[in-house]
């Protein structure tokens, strides 16, 4: 019988996978994985050489050099073509050699788990061949890439494709891409019928101004949850032990309590200015109670550059340090050639970063937080005020990003407190900061007021939050919230803060900070912060967008304001003393803005992670220069309840000398390049 090309490739792949081999090393479950690699190609109809240059030796060299716990390799990208020979879906026409078969064979021989990268909601080929599967726009036109969650696409094509790959290649799991972040409102007939049945509203809303807009987005979110539940359950049934996730679900992109049986959580950071995104995403994922990792792109693009460039290893190490310090796993994404080749330069960089991470794995992976400063994260605000079902949220997330950056720049160890978790976890934190969210809701307001009444220290930012809690706090306000631009001052100058402000009608004795209508401190002072006793605790109310202002454009003047508000509430547990003897005291630079402190614990020991973020791009307009300046010796103090038995610098294993006095261990860190851990024994 003569075989056609697809049947020949499928038969060849089966033969490759069926070769008798020695007993394979056991592969780690995802919960035990710490470092991984990701490769995707998004095959298209224009590919002619898929798999041509891929060899067992190349894959083996990569695995032996980098020693990842898992690899994620492409099987379907957003165009919709499969990268392997398939009897279920449409394979890319240019498959010369079955890459997935080679990756499975070699990873299995090395005890490395293999996951496939698989595009879910986004499938351009599916909607081209089946227009009835396409998501419908408000203009009545079918989408060119996005499938409809109300269509037969998932059952008829997506799940069978996933099951075929899982079985034929004995995959350990899937990383489903193009999912929650790709979902936009669907105006198909099925959505219209469902919406009318649930709300009684006959016309689907087009904008937030239309009746039923929030209900419409909530319906889309629920439809997505049902879609994810179906493919997760199907794969768990088809291949028991299969581990699967939906990219970015249950992160800040979908900030809700995890209820679906995803086996792990994961997301790929933006290629530009990724460290800043890593700070907030790592802190959010660490709260969700599931194994998690974050992925750095190993390269960066941008029209402003007119070219693509690999990231230097030190930039990836800074991004990795931010992730692993929160207890998570880490992976790096690179793109092979269309023919499957991975150059040794990519291998060397990945190997360097992997070695950096492995040295820190013992005291990083699956550690637990020591609560210090908690930033309240309002998923409700994002779901109620954004114009899409899920993130990325862009500037709408500035309140949280700004608060995290601001607190880190002042030396605090910072966690996020998701609103769905606040009632059960907020009491652990000696300091809680509520950014200037617009719609935290009455349930959150009650939780926050109760936290302060029980003795908590709370910084409440934003006009809307001040108004919402004014009754509970017995806070007098003067007038409604209005748009203003005020000038905030410290000893060095002024910073403008524009946005929604509300007047404070408190007694002068409660005012702790003022702003000005012009850059002139002689007149027109406007109270912008007040200290309010509440029960056993203290609430500092800042009546404007302090967190968002810092998130949109950090400045040391806003740090000065924040110190004025926060230091009396709770001082950081770790403080640094600059060692610049040639400078006058008033000219000595701040150390905190470039040093991140993360307090963790593991195996009964206190862990102080120190991350040097010098040189990290904070905007996509600039690239990392590949140099991270060392700090030199750092005098530091760590507040501890008892004198420690030992303080060891990891990963060097160097025991540090120091003294314990007045509740603080004081010592000298010889030097800090990118990341180090003070492992403190016997101080709990």
Predicted regions and their residues:
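Active-site neighborhood of glycoside hydrolase catalytic domains
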Residues: 154-252
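N-terminal secretory signal peptides
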Residues: 1-3
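Carbohydrate-binding surfaces of carbohydrate-active enzymes
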Residues: 31, 114, 168, 213-684
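N-terminal export signals
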Residues: 7-24
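Aromatic- and glycine-enriched glycan-recognition loops and surfaces
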Residues: 47-66, 87-110, 226, 397-398, ...
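N-terminal structural segment of carbohydrate-active enzymes
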Residues: 25-80
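Active-site-adjacent "subsite" loops/lids of carbohydrate-active enzymes
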Residues: 116-169, 206-214
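Aromatic-lined carbohydrate-binding/catalytic grooves of carbohydrate-active enzymes
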Residues: 66-99, 122-141, 185-186, 190, ...
